[in-house]
């Protein structure tokens, strides 16, 4: 890609510096010089070691675990850039934390996804670039442009190369009713049929698989979702496909590998042969499982950043 010298600058916090470096590599530019650290009392500080006056600045920072620290790093860096007279600031948030708190599920609940949107805007962000928001309506929580990239083209390319034309006995599976639209779009691109696992969630981070909708008997199934958190939903869905549905095998893919708590242990002990994830969240404990495979998002984000900088449509990236 074209290098734009001082006119475009990419900075990052501590959440995923390797992704930021890879994005810069594909863009043909270097990562901006900065320091993001903490004082002795835990307060976060940001120091910028190069001028950003008038520059089109992109800050790469996933708000993954530790969520609050990474979010504060992002907000403080945006504020520092704004006060340093950056021309435009784009918050590049490959994984947007707090996205699951997008509505009032019960009385007196906060809508934290909206609060985070307000904080990013107040800090000085001029636009947001993210990927596979857990709830697409979060785009409407902002009064600034939000580009929500889709991760499924990366998975489509991966599985097309992996299985080639041998897709007759394969089926895409939505792990719950709420993910049907996302899984259907993925299945259509792979020219596969769709099945659904109907589940009833008893409490947060636990679920009970109830029924398999669709004939998966003897099929090789690909479960498709936007994230893997504790792995409970994923592993229960996979077990249901084998036990209740009679599936031949199960693999899975998801955009965001949160992998909190017992997730990796559950995956290792499950019937799932492979879990393909995108590296929107830095793969910290992935080495503990040979079933987890990471696919790079840097090329897609680099192209999106180039297009935003050049004021060119990015709609092509959503197809």
Describe every region a protein language model picked out.
Residues 1-319:
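PRPP-associated nucleotide enzymes
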């Amino acid at each position: 890609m074209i290098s734009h010298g001082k006119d475009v600058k990419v900075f990052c916090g501590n959440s995923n510096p390797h992704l930021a470096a890879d994005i810069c590599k594909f863009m043909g530019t270097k990562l901006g010089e900065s320091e993001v650290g903490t004082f002795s009392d835990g307060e976060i500080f940001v120091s910028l070691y190069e001028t950003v006056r008038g520059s089109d600045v992109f800050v790469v920072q996933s708000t993954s675990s530790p969520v609050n620290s990474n979010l504060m790093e992002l907000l403080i860096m945006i504020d520092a850039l704004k006060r340093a007279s950056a021309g435009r600031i784009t918050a590049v948030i490959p994984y947007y934390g707090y996205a699951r708190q997008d509505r009032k599920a019960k009385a007196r609940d906060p809508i934290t996804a909206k609060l985070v949107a307000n904080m990013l805007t107040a800090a000085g962000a001029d636009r947001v670039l993210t990927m596979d928001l857990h709830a697409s309506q979060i785009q409407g929580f902002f009064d600034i442009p939000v580009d929500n990239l889709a991760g499924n083209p990366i998975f489509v390319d991966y599985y097309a190369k992996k299985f080639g034309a041998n897709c007759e006995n394969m089926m895409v599976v939505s792990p719950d009713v709420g993910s049907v639209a996302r899984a259907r779009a993925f299945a259509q691109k792979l020219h596969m049929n769709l099945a659904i696992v109907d589940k009833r969630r008893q409490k947060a981070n636990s679920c009970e698989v109830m029924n398999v909708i669709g004939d998966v008997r003897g099929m090789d199934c690909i479960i498709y979702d936007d994230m893997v958190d504790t792995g409970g939903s994923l592993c229960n869905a996979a077990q249901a496909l084998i036990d209740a549905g009679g599936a031949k095998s199960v693999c899975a893919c998801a955009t965001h590998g949160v992998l909190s708590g017992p997730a990796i242990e559950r995956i290792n002990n499950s019937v799932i042969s492979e879990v393909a994830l995108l590296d929107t969240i830095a793969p910290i404990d992935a080495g503990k499982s040979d079933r987890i495979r990471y696919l790079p998002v840097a090329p897609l984000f680099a192209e999106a950043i180039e297009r935003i900088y050049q004021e060119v449509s990015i709609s092509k990236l959503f197809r």
